[in-house]
Amino acid sequence: MLTDITLGQYYPGNSCIHRLDPRTKILAVLFYMVMVFLANSPLSYGILIGFIVLGAALAKLPAGLLLRSIKPLWIIILLTMVIHFVTDPGEALWHWKFITVTREGIVLGVKMSLRLVLLLLVSSLMTFTTSPIVLTDGIESLLRPFKKIGVPAHELAMMMTIALRFIPTLLEETDRIMKAQMSRGADFSSGNIMKRAKNMLPILIPLFISSFRRADELALAMEARCYRGGEGRTRMHELVYGKADALTGLVMLALFVLLAFLRWGIPA
């Protein structure tokens, strides 16, 4: 169901990945995303997949937890692959009426789908190992230099974190409403796509009402705790870079150099 979406959820732990500075993890994820688009060979993608597997092992995440983040989006991933199969020009491998599958389309379709999977996995790995509060502190710290040009660093960080954390909350609420409707005889699994979409309409109004209610409750809770933004705000634990963060930075740099070499080789 919709609760299978894991992006935005935090998995408590005390692994070396959990203990990394949030700024290190955020920068590492951004760096990894760049490398995903840099990869262009099976070996490159194998290295990136190995990095995710190693990260999940070091974070001591349960087997299959990361893979759950792919399940809700498998239709989008599959659709991306199929579209490339039949729309990209190249050497024809199979033809039926107006549909032509090309070799280049298959290669590009697999690449694009794999990129989507890797981007989703690395994002989920970060949110699994970083609590919302720590993630907010990390984003705020990275945005702090932009305060000189008027960028509200803390407010932006808080908005981004609340939005990210609200994803699983909203999905849980949707699942709860769907189960309540199903107990009253609603059917969301049968019929064609149009009928299923029409059957989802009764969910929208209670979902909107519930979302506004939760947002109002959050605002009241923040006011009750005298929340006044980032000005003068202190932290229980200050962010400090350690040896593990430096080692992570070196690993990411080495990985980038390796992928750049695999893509372009040694310049003459």
UniProtKB/Swiss-Prot annotation:
It is a multi-pass membrane protein. InterPro entries: ABC/ECF_trnsptr_transmembrane (IPR003339), ECF_transporter_component (IPR051611), EcfT (IPR024919). It is found in: Cell membrane. The chain crosses the membrane at residues 26-46, 47-67, 73-93, 116-136, 151-171, 246-266. Keywords: Cell membrane, Membrane, Transmembrane, Transmembrane helix, Transport. Pfam families: CbiQ (PF02361). Its main location: membrane. GO terms for cellular component: plasma membrane. Signal peptide: none annotated. GO terms for molecular function: transmembrane transporter activity. Belongs to the energy-coupling factor EcfT family. Transmembrane (T) component of an energy-coupling factor (ECF) ABC-transporter complex. Unlike classic ABC transporters this ECF transporter provides the energy necessary to transport a number of different substrates. Forms a stable energy-coupling factor (ECF) transporter complex composed of 2 membrane-embedded substrate-binding proteins (S component), 2 ATP-binding proteins (A component) and 2 transmembrane proteins (T component). May be able to interact with more than 1 S component at a time. PANTHER family: SLL0384 PROTEIN. This is Energy-coupling factor transporter transmembrane protein EcfT. It comes from Acidaminococcus fermentans (strain ATCC 25085 / DSM 20731 / CCUG 9996 / CIP 106432 / VR4).
